[in-house]
Amino acid sequence: MSSERTFLPNGNYKIKSLFSDSLYLTYSSGSLSFLNTSSLDNQKWKLEYISSSNGFRFSNVAEPNKYLAYNDYGFIYLSSSSNNSLWNPIKIAINSYIICTLSIVNVTDYAWTIYDNNNNITDQPILNLPNFDINNSNQILKLEKL
Protein backbone atom coordinates (compact mmCIF):
# COMPACT_ATOMS: atom_id res chain seq x y z
CA MET A 1 0.00 0.00 0.00
CA SER A 2 1.13 3.50 -0.71
CA SER A 3 1.21 6.08 2.02
CA GLU A 4 0.66 8.89 -0.49
CA ARG A 5 -2.29 11.18 0.04
CA THR A 6 -5.56 9.90 -1.36
CA PHE A 7 -7.13 12.78 -3.24
CA LEU A 8 -10.32 13.75 -1.49
CA PRO A 9 -11.38 17.38 -1.52
CA ASN A 10 -12.23 19.01 1.79
CA GLY A 11 -15.97 19.33 2.26
CA ASN A 12 -19.08 17.63 3.54
CA TYR A 13 -19.77 13.95 2.90
CA LYS A 14 -22.17 11.21 3.83
CA ILE A 15 -20.51 7.93 4.81
CA LYS A 16 -22.37 4.89 3.50
CA SER A 17 -21.74 1.26 4.28
CA LEU A 18 -21.05 -0.95 1.29
CA PHE A 19 -22.27 -3.86 3.43
CA SER A 20 -25.78 -2.42 3.42
CA ASP A 21 -26.19 0.07 0.61
CA SER A 22 -28.93 2.15 2.25
CA LEU A 23 -27.37 2.77 5.69
CA TYR A 24 -25.33 5.86 6.58
CA LEU A 25 -23.06 6.69 9.51
CA THR A 26 -25.17 8.66 11.98
CA TYR A 27 -24.35 10.41 15.24
CA SER A 28 -27.28 10.33 17.64
CA SER A 29 -27.67 10.51 21.40
CA GLY A 30 -23.94 10.23 22.02
CA SER A 31 -23.29 7.21 19.83
CA LEU A 32 -22.47 6.26 16.24
CA SER A 33 -24.49 3.79 14.22
CA PHE A 34 -25.62 3.11 10.69
CA LEU A 35 -29.19 4.17 9.95
CA ASN A 36 -31.36 4.80 6.91
CA THR A 37 -30.60 7.99 5.04
CA SER A 38 -31.98 11.33 6.07
CA SER A 39 -31.20 14.95 5.31
CA LEU A 40 -30.28 15.76 8.92
CA ASP A 41 -26.86 17.18 9.76
CA ASN A 42 -26.08 14.25 12.07
CA GLN A 43 -25.48 12.13 8.93
CA LYS A 44 -23.15 14.69 7.36
CA TRP A 45 -19.41 14.63 7.97
CA LYS A 46 -16.92 17.39 7.28
CA LEU A 47 -13.72 15.94 5.86
CA GLU A 48 -10.62 18.08 6.28
CA TYR A 49 -7.08 17.35 5.14
CA ILE A 50 -4.53 18.23 7.83
CA SER A 51 -1.35 18.87 5.83
CA SER A 52 0.94 19.06 8.87
CA SER A 53 0.00 15.45 9.73
CA ASN A 54 -0.62 14.18 6.19
CA GLY A 55 -3.98 12.80 7.32
CA PHE A 56 -7.69 13.49 7.27
CA ARG A 57 -10.03 14.43 10.09
CA PHE A 58 -13.81 13.86 10.14
CA SER A 59 -16.11 16.10 12.18
CA ASN A 60 -19.88 15.86 12.40
CA VAL A 61 -21.77 18.78 10.83
CA ALA A 62 -24.25 18.76 13.75
CA GLU A 63 -21.35 18.72 16.28
CA PRO A 64 -18.57 20.63 14.46
CA ASN A 65 -16.12 20.62 17.40
CA LYS A 66 -16.13 16.83 17.71
CA TYR A 67 -14.05 14.41 15.65
CA LEU A 68 -14.24 10.75 14.74
CA ALA A 69 -11.56 9.14 16.91
CA TYR A 70 -10.81 5.75 18.44
CA ASN A 71 -10.23 4.76 22.05
CA ASP A 72 -7.90 2.19 23.65
CA TYR A 73 -10.55 -0.53 23.21
CA GLY A 74 -10.80 0.02 19.45
CA PHE A 75 -14.21 1.70 19.41
CA ILE A 76 -14.69 4.62 17.05
CA TYR A 77 -16.60 7.47 18.64
CA LEU A 78 -17.11 11.23 18.45
CA SER A 79 -14.58 13.05 20.62
CA SER A 80 -14.02 16.68 21.56
CA SER A 81 -10.29 15.93 21.59
CA SER A 82 -8.30 15.73 18.38
CA ASN A 83 -6.22 12.83 19.78
CA ASN A 84 -6.49 9.62 17.73
CA SER A 85 -8.57 11.42 15.10
CA LEU A 86 -6.34 11.33 12.01
CA TRP A 87 -7.23 8.88 9.26
CA ASN A 88 -5.93 7.69 5.90
CA PRO A 89 -8.75 6.82 3.47
CA ILE A 90 -7.34 4.25 1.03
CA LYS A 91 -9.22 4.28 -2.26
CA ILE A 92 -10.09 0.82 -3.54
CA ALA A 93 -12.77 1.71 -6.13
CA ILE A 94 -14.73 4.76 -7.28
CA ASN A 95 -15.87 6.58 -4.11
CA SER A 96 -15.06 3.43 -2.09
CA TYR A 97 -12.50 3.49 0.69
CA ILE A 98 -11.03 1.57 3.57
CA ILE A 99 -10.32 4.11 6.31
CA CYS A 100 -7.12 3.38 8.22
CA THR A 101 -5.66 5.11 11.23
CA LEU A 102 -2.58 7.32 11.11
CA SER A 103 -1.87 7.14 14.83
CA ILE A 104 -0.56 3.59 14.84
CA VAL A 105 2.95 2.82 13.59
CA ASN A 106 1.93 0.87 10.48
CA VAL A 107 -0.74 2.93 8.72
CA THR A 108 -2.34 -0.01 6.96
CA ASP A 109 -2.70 -2.29 9.97
CA TYR A 110 -5.88 -0.87 11.50
CA ALA A 111 -9.10 0.04 9.67
CA TRP A 112 -12.71 0.94 10.40
CA THR A 113 -14.76 -2.23 10.69
CA ILE A 114 -18.52 -2.28 11.09
CA TYR A 115 -19.61 -4.94 13.53
CA ASP A 116 -22.48 -6.96 12.17
CA ASN A 117 -24.92 -9.08 14.11
CA ASN A 118 -26.25 -11.80 11.81
CA ASN A 119 -25.90 -9.58 8.73
CA ASN A 120 -27.53 -6.62 10.46
CA ILE A 121 -25.38 -3.52 11.08
CA THR A 122 -28.15 -1.26 12.38
CA ASP A 123 -27.21 0.05 15.83
CA GLN A 124 -23.91 -1.85 15.82
CA PRO A 125 -20.57 -0.29 16.81
CA ILE A 126 -17.80 0.79 14.48
CA LEU A 127 -14.42 -0.56 15.48
CA ASN A 128 -10.81 0.23 14.60
CA LEU A 129 -9.48 -3.29 14.06
CA PRO A 130 -6.25 -4.80 12.69
CA ASN A 131 -5.85 -6.70 9.44
CA PHE A 132 -7.98 -4.88 6.93
CA ASP A 133 -9.15 -6.84 3.90
CA ILE A 134 -10.30 -5.30 0.60
CA ASN A 135 -12.70 -8.22 0.20
CA ASN A 136 -14.45 -7.52 3.51
CA SER A 137 -17.53 -5.41 2.82
CA ASN A 138 -17.74 -4.54 6.54
CA GLN A 139 -14.60 -2.45 6.02
CA ILE A 140 -15.52 -0.73 2.75
CA LEU A 141 -17.25 2.62 2.93
CA LYS A 142 -18.56 4.95 0.25
CA LEU A 143 -17.90 8.65 0.71
CA GLU A 144 -20.65 10.63 -1.02
CA LYS A 145 -19.72 14.29 -1.56
CA LEU A 146 -22.56 16.66 -0.73
From Swiss-Prot:
Its main location: secreted. CDD domains: beta-trefoil_Ricin_HA17 (cd23494). Transmembrane segments: none annotated. It is found in: Secreted. The hemagglutinin (HA) component of the progenitor toxin protects the structural integrity of the neurotoxin; may increase internalization of the neurotoxin into the bloodstream of the host. Involved in binding to the small intestine through interactions with glycolipids and glycoproteins containing sialic acid moieties. The hemagglutinin complex composed of HA-70, HA-33 and HA-17 agglutinates erythrocytes, whereas the individual compenents do not. Erythrocyte agglutination also occurs with the entire toxin complex. This protein can also be encoded on a prophage. This is Hemagglutinin component HA-17 type D. The lineage of its organism: Viruses, Duplodnaviria, Heunggongvirae, Uroviricota, Caudoviricetes. The gene is ha-17.
